[in-house]
A protein has these predicted regions:
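Membrane-lumen/periplasm interface segments of specific transmembrane helices
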Residues: 22-37, 295, 309-312, 316-399
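Hydrophobic, aromatic-rich transmembrane alpha-helices
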Residues: 63-71, 386-420, 442
Length: 645
């Protein structure tokens, strides 16, 4: 007697739904859900032409990848492999430039602004001022909290890259001098560009080149790693898929993109160690794996989990291969790996006086001070890196590779779970966990390649289509880096008819002039309002110091009792004075709120400029009434009674 058939789902269809539905849901949320339910980051409508350029570039690369993979032999010659990796490198840089163009009218200028900025890369500001390396290392932990928001939470490795750039360029002062006219205006977001010499400025260009080269060397190591596991076709697929993941394209100038090098180098060395358990090269591989982890943690303490990925992968592979039959050998290799990691740190402590414990405690204290709700972020943390590593590949690497690559799947999933549950991250995991991305891509390529080397082209085409769509929407809409505005793109404002004109000037030679302002005359206690200032840079060269604007509304010229106290970087924090162009007019709006207990009457409006870093006020060159380098505006600020109709 026939049994009634139940409803069954075709396994391939189930896999496609698992891979595709999260991506489609995410793209839908990006486009139509303005809340942050599924999308953590801020969003903005992209300009049409740059978005079309990016989408075209992604589609072209996808087509090239499919065409190449359809024609690749099972085994590549060294020339074929080199040509393929050269293409991936060039395609990656080109796609990165197109992605940067979404938010930067001039992408190369934008990369420079990011590199020098206190608000983004952040490391340049520290690195260029390191003259005595050993002395700086000795006092590093004491100075960390005086650094900007990024450098204060990291070990000294990244500033040392810029120190290296300075040392390499010192013997070539003519080259640095030739670059200076181009680079100095691009360093204006450093806030103190006037204090940088030509060689230090050129070191910023060195940093841009090194970061870009390092970021697009990741698919090269990815090829090497996957080649060891599954052959040339899977390796080629992994390298070709990597430029389609959003995080590799939109974090230009952020060193986190390159931290996947440490993940891959560790895994490659683990494989080398396993392949030669009792030979010298196996022990050497273990030591160098530890050394790679040292370099990774020297760049960022946040790279410590790479040790967990490598350790769990090694243990799982050893168990599968040997069931611990060679445990004394493996224990010795583990000791060598620990020496490779801890030995250089010990040398820095003993020889340079570096305070490792103090630096780590300071970095973690500042990092963990960022408040994030626990349970929402237990889910947000993995979701964020899933979206930046490409949702189709992340779903494959999490759910579908347990049979194809159990050790690697276990290593990365367990590390991800531990990171999320321990709550050591504080948001932005799509950036700071980019060391997971090449592992995710590797697992995706392993699943898309059969054990005998054949490629699953139907699934591959589906995955590439999803990746292309997600990358275009994700990069086009999300806004993850903000440092300010390119001064040459700032429109010249039209002076309003109700402008109150002034002859107020600041700086020793009157380089900064307040052309005028607009403010309404009467306010009530607790009321919010705006004051629009119109500045002009009347000097002939760039301004050497970044100034903030302060606005005080006070009962006396001595500035004792304030009912308004507002300050900020000009143009809504987007344009420090160091970026103002000679002759440029700046519209600078400030929003304020009158104190709720303000008494009715007339008040003075005092304005001025002060150094962002020291707090010292700028010299008042011209003003009718000035007290303590603050200028009283001609208009009076009137607070009306709350009972007044």
């Amino acid at each position: 007697m026939k049994q009634p058939r139940g409803i069954s789902l075709n396994p391939k269809l189930g896999q496609m739904l698992l891979i595709g539905l999260p991506t489609l849901a995410y793209i839908t949320a990006l486009l139509f859900d303005s809340s942050r339910t599924v999308v953590l980051w801020e969003r903005s409508a992209p300009p049409a032409a740059p978005l079309a350029l990016l989408a075209t570039g992604l589609a072209l690369h996808s087509a090239v990848a499919l065409a190449l993979l359809a024609r690749l032999p099972r085994t590549l010659s060294s020339k074929q492999a080199a040509a393929l990796l050269a293409y991936v490198f060039v395609a990656g840089v080109a796609l990165q430039t197109a992605a940067t163009h979404i938010v930067e009218p001039f992408p190369l200028r934008g990369l420079a602004f990011r590199q020098y900025s206190d608000f983004t890369g952040g490391y340049f500001t520290v690195g260029v001022r390191v003259d005595d390396l050993w002395g700086w290392l000795a006092r590093f932990s004491q100075e960390m909290e005086s650094y900007n928001v990024h450098a204060e939470r990291h070990p000294p490795g990244l500033p040392m890259i810029f120190w290296l750039g300075v040392q390499l360029l010192r013997p070539f002062p003519e080259l640095a001098a030739a670059l200076e006219p181009t680079l100095r205006p691009l360093a204006c977001f450093d806030l103190r560009p006037g204090e940088l010499d030509a060689v230090q400025l050129a070191a910023g260009l060195f940093g841009i080149l090194i970061e870009t080269i390092a970021a697009w060397s990741v698919p090269i190591l990815l090829f090497v790693f996957v080649q060891r596991l599954a052959g040339d076709r899977a390796a080629a697929m992994a390298a070709l898929l990597y430029p389609l993941i959003p995080g590799a394209l939109m974090w230009a100038s952020q060193w986190d993109r390159s931290f996947g090098l440490f993940s891959l180098a560790t895994l490659i060395l683990v494989e080398a160690m396993l392949a030669a358990p009792v030979r010298p090269r196996g022990f050497a591989a273990a030591f160098f794996a530890g050394l790679v982890l040292f370099l990774g943690t020297l760049m960022s303490f946040g790279n410590l989990p790479i040790a967990m990925i490598g350790g769990l992968y090694a243990l799982a592979r050893i168990w599968a291969l040997e069931q611990l039959r060679l445990w004394p050998v493996r224990l010795a290799q583990g000791v060598l790996a620990f020496i490779g990691l801890a030995g250089p740190w010990a040398a820095l402590v003993l020889l340079a006086g570096f305070d490792l414990r103090g630096s780590y405690e300071t970095a973690m204290r500042l990092h963990l001070a960022l408040e994030r709700d626990y349970w929402p972020f237990v889910l947000w943390h993995p979701w964020d890196i899933f979206t930046f590593a490409g949702l189709p590949l992340a779903m494959i690497a999490t759910c579908l590779t347990w049979q194809r690559a159990p050790a690697l799947t276990f290593a990365w999933v367990a590390t991800l779970a531990a990171q999320s549950l321990l709550h050591v991250a504080r948001g932005e995991t799509g950036r700071v966990w980019m060391y997971f991305a090449p592992v995710i891509v590797a697992l995706g390529s392993l699943w898309l390649t059969r054990r005998e080397g054949a490629i699953r082209f139907a699934q591959l085409s589906f995955v590439i289509g999803l990746l292309t769509a997600q990358a275009a929407a994700h990069i086009g809409l999300l806004r993850v880096i903000g440092y300010g505005a390119d001064p040459i793109t700032v429109p010249r404002p039209t002076l309003p008819a109700n402008l109150v004109s002034t002859e107020i000037r600041f700086e020793p030679n009157g380089e900064i002039r307040l052309l005028g302002y607009v403010i309404k005359q009467t306010f009530r206690p607790g009321e919010s309002g705006t004051i629009d200032l119109y500045w002009r840079h009347e000097g002939e060269t760039f301004l050497p110091r970044a100034r903030k604007v302060f606005i005080h509304v006070t009962d006396t010229l001595e500035d004792r009792e304030r009912i308004v106290n507002q300050d900020g970087r000009p143009a809504n924090w987007t344009l420090p004075t160091t970026c103002w162009l000679p002759g440029q007019v700046i519209h600078d709006r400030h929003i304020f709120t009158v104190a709720g207990d303000a008494q009715p009457g007339e008040y003075y409006v005092l304005i001025g400029l002060y150094d962002e870093l020291t707090g010292e006020r700028a010299f008042v060159h011209t003003a009718q009434v000035a007290v303590a380098n603050a200028v009283a505006l001609p208009s009076r600020f009137v607070v009306a009674s709350l009972n007044r109709e």
